[in-house]
Amino acid sequence: MRHYEIVFMVHPDQSEQVPGMIERYTGVITEANGTIHRLEDWGRRQLAYPILDLHKAHYVLMNVEAKAETIEELETAFRFNDAVLRNMVMRTKVAVTEASPMAKARDERDSRRGPAGERSYDEAHAEEIAE
């Protein structure tokens, strides 16, 4: 079996259907004895250029280990799903399991913000010192 990195972009109006799509696509891979090494839902992001007059899309990243036939089946599913705006499947040499730069940036941003969007202790303390 080979390793693949898969990114697909979903129409922003269909964002609520993304968890079901992820479940369906991961099911296709696991039923064919494939392995999912990394799965990241990046959420809605700004597009670099408009696609079908849309400026945002819902991004999903998967790193999987599967047979070529399974990947072909997945690409066919992408092609016939109108909600999938774009998809990219790249073969990789090794399984990638570490968090992507996008996920790391989100985690860092969330940790600075603190629970429920509160400012961190450092930010609040810096304001007190400045006063």
UniProtKB/Swiss-Prot annotation:
This is Small ribosomal subunit protein bS6. Gene3D superfamilies: 3.30.70.60. The gene is rpsF. CDD domains: bS6 (cd00473). InterPro entries: Ribosomal_bS6, Ribosomal_bS6_sf, Ribosomal_S6_plastid/chlpt, Transl_elong_EF1B/ribsomal_bS6. It comes from the Bacteria. One of its GO terms (cellular component) is cytosolic small ribosomal subunit. NCBIfam families: S6. Binds together with bS18 to 16S ribosomal RNA. Pfam families: Ribosomal_S6. Belongs to the bacterial ribosomal protein bS6 family. Residues 104-131 have a biased composition (Basic and acidic residues).
